[in-house]
């Protein structure tokens, strides 16, 4: 009986964590869409990132790396160094948003049947041990990272056009 209860509670917890992650993913996409097009291509911070670059970073360095490469062990193309932060001028804003949405769907599908206690199956050859030891920890990390970057986009948007987003996110179900 205890195993069934634990498995059921893990399924509920996983669904809740994915719901919160989806809420943050939506926050990111909404803020990028809400910005004036020219503002998506320029930086307003000393580090030099742009909203388009941040979107690409979340697509490749976060969703693809953590879920498809690290957890699922898929052999996927990964950017090197800071290349994930550089959005090609060839990609339209809508294409970058579509790539982000597609990668989020692929990431969610890749971990679909995994238990929260599942261990990473891949890590960078020269990177030592993975910093997180389970899908649960990786989900929490990605939620925090995505929410942090959503906040960066909130600030960017307010600086460029004064727009503000009231953060009353609820998990998707």
Sequence positions of predicted segments:
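Short, contiguous alpha-helical
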Residues: 4-8, 14, 18-33, 37-84, ...
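Acidic/histidine-rich alpha-helical segments that form the ligand environment
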Residues: 84-123, 134-147
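Active-site rim elements
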Residues: 12-17, 93-97
């Amino acid at each position: 009986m205890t195993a069934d209860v634990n498995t059921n509670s893990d399924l509920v917890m996983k669904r809740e964590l994915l719901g919160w992650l989806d809420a943050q993913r939506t926050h990111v996409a909404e803020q990028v869409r809400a910005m004036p097009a020219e503002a998506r291509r320029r930086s307003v911070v000393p580090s030099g990132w742009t909203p388009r670059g941040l979107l690409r970073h979340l697509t490749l360095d976060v969703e693809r790396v953590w879920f498809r490469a690290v957890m699922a062990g898929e052999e996927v193309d990964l950017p090197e160094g800071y290349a994930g932060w550089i959005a090609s001028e060839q990609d339209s804003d809508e294409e970058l948003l579509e790539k982000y949405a597609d990668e989020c769907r692929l990431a969610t599908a890749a971990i679909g049947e995994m238990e929260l206690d599942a261990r990473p199956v891949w890590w960078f050859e020269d990177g030592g041990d993975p910093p997180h030891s389970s899908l649960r920890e990786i989900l929490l990390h990605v939620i925090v990272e995505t929410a942090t970057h959503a906040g960066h986009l909130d600030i960017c948007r307010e600086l460029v056009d004064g727009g503000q987003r009231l953060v009353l996110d609820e998990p998707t179900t």
